[in-house]
Amino acid sequence: MNILFVSGHPAQVHNFRNVRAELIKQDHRVFWLTTPKDIATNLLDIYQIPYQLLYKPNKNILSKAWTLLRNVIWEICFLRQNKIDVAITRTCPYTTIAAKICGVKHIIIDDTEHAARKMKIFSNLANVVIIPECFDFQLRSDELRFLGNVELFYLHQNRFAPSSIWNLLNTESDTRFAIVRFVKWDAWHDTELVGGFTLDQKRELVARLQKHMRVFISSETELPTDLEPYRIQIPIDKLIFEVLVLD
């Protein structure tokens, strides 16, 4: 079979890379499309996964609408040219529309409940929708639910063995530390959510924590000069989960 994966976020590279490897072992032809978001392409390069780029929109509505149209048309051509049988994605409007037009089977695997609510119209167009058992609402009557979460695609004990956290953090063993995560809050599914900490609150949080332990910051955004020294420095192919595992 000819199978397509589409990623729109770096985490989705981790979600699907092991599935891709297993499918290749079974002699399937596997393709990959991605939007150039954050370090997604860097991860694909590190894992030596060939890919082609989709267009990335700007933040304004007109740009998003234009990019949606361009990507749908581009994917229609891609699906037909490569005779794709099945597309596997998280919630992805481009692929959903293109697959429906081309008659390609489309599987959506989603784990972000508030995002899934917003994108329910696209879930209804897919052939199969797979979500965690913990979802509080029903996307569709024939949805498939699983016990667990998508992080187990790459963090299951049969797939993941953490490195030594002390080597990754370049610190003494048994050092008490905290990992603080700051996100952009600019994703389409974050638009109706409270926007996290203010800059002053971030500074206060770090100041309070560092009285008791060493502080590392994982941030999607630029940090002010006084917080930048706290930014965690680990290779991009090392998961933040590696420093959350007890050594």
Question: Which role does the model predict for each range below?
Answer:
Residues P10-I24:
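Short amphipathic alpha-helix
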Residues I24-T67:
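Conserved nucleotide-sugar phosphate-binding/catalytic loop shared by glycosyltransferases and other
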Residues Y47-Y51, P57-N58, V206-I234:
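Catalytic donor nucleotide-activated moiety binding site of glycosyltransferases and closely related
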Residues I61-K83:
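An amphipathic, basic-hydrophobic alpha-helix
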Residues N71-L79, T221-D247:
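Donor nucleotide-activated moiety binding/catalytic core segment of transferases
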Residues A87-A98, I108, I236-D247:
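A donor-sugar binding/catalytic signature common to diverse glycosyltransferases
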Residues I107-I109, M119-I131:
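A conserved, positively charged/aromatic
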Residues I130-F197:
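A nucleotide-sugar donor-handling region in carbohydrate enzymes
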